């Protein structure tokens, strides 16, 4: 099973904040960073899914999955554009939707979305490393994502809204009304949801392949050596929290 080191988890978090600072405009960056600051401890360790054979069901899996989708969506957008597709959205809109399509998986203001599976039977027979938190009010993941964004006063464009809603494509029955319309007036006005869905699929399957390879991805990858005492202290604190929560 793939694992991330404490250094990788910290590095991925720093990269996530760098992406926000680089791609999100001044008009909503402060509110967005406030949300990420409030959720930092929970989000850094959140998994991307509940079952080992799905994708990134591990501490730190959520942030890594989001970073993969941001990267892949920009790459796929370039391929679409190169081959003649209409690109009528900004990179900021694409990155914003990629960043937040799974935001609902961090839970709400009080509760985690995933909690550790405490049933040995489910862990052994269903590969359930985590389970859904029964204390959490039910919402679909995109709906909770949009609710959290509005709670923090983060404005969302119509393209971002639809992109976040439709990233799961036809895997979500609720998306049929958008994706299977037989009236051209009701069709999508942008290719962004298709690009996001392809990026999500690509990330999910690659992460699943990494899980299958198992021991080949056990060793830490791309881990930076701390350059300052403050950075080393931050890593040491994170390791302590990592050990407390998961060992």
What are these regions (language model features)?
Residues 181-247:
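Acidic, carboxylate-rich catalytic segments that either coordinate divalent cations
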Residues 24-28, 44, 172, 207-210, ...:
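Residue-level signal for secondary-structure boundary elements
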Residues 1-124:
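Acidic/His-rich, divalent-metal-binding segments that scaffold phosphate/diphosphate chemistry
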Residues 10-21, 29-37, 161, 165, ...:
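Generic detector of well-ordered alpha-helical segments enriched in charged/polar residues
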Residues 55-58, 64, 76, 87-211:
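Divalent metal-dependent catalytic cores for phosphoryl transfer on phosphate-bearing substrates
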